[in-house]
Amino acid sequence: MAIKTSTSRKIFVIFNYTFLAILALICIFPFIHLLALSFSSDEFTSKGLVSVYPMGFTLDAYMILATKPEFFKAFGISVARTILGTSLALLVIILTAYPLSKSNKVLKGRTAIAWIFVFTMFFGGTLASQYVLYRMLGLLDNFLVYILPGACDVWFVLMLMNFFRGIPKEIEEAALIDGCNHFQILFRIFVPISVPVIVTIILFTAVGQWNSWFDGIFFMSDTTSYPLQSYLYVMLESSDPAKLAQNGTLTPQQIEQLKNLGSKNLQAAQIFLGMLPITLVYPFLQKYFIKGITIGSVKG
């Protein structure tokens, strides 16, 4: 039997879909505009004529980027820090959240330890103290400065801890009776059950690692060791085609290509390539992301 829908309900649904469609277009427009700029010639971008489709279509911006090895080196550094940093952070977060999910009877002083973690969320060190600490630890001008400082995010520890606490104790007790130790319980039972939350942590951590520019600027003196975002931060101020033509590293054909380019074209191409990897990965993890946020926030 068909369910009748009232007129007010239909209007409400139409309004919701219209509103969400407009909101989606507002979110997508910057990406489309950026892509259009990267494929347009300076004749049109300099006059502000490019909106959602390229004008004076050209691939010169991407051809010029292909001749800049420092761009691809920075890209590789960002890929390495994202993979290694996310992997280490996930391992540390899991190994920290599991014991904190136990009661005070199992882990003596568990409450005090948890409050120490929470304290660090509200009272962090200043930039000067961070710099001094990293210098003492030998992290300045060291690739590890991209990985170690973010290896234990307290927010994610608390999120995963709350999820672990929501897992029925009977499951753990049955595993202990069967002869499992805590590492086996953690990685064979708790981790598989917690996939939605873990994928959420992976996504947040990977995005944070990929988008980080601050540590490269302040803790690396060698610009060739910059990750992509730090490199873009510097290059966006010096991507004038005239400067590139004067550095003597381009061929006559590439210099000819620069005549059709402006700084906006190169900037748009670099930014678009920089955000592309995360943009491509996110849709595949979206279902876990939404579920993980919801479950991780209410468990326990």
Language-model regions, residue ranges each:
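A hydrophobic, multi-pass inner-membrane permease signature
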Residues: 2-300
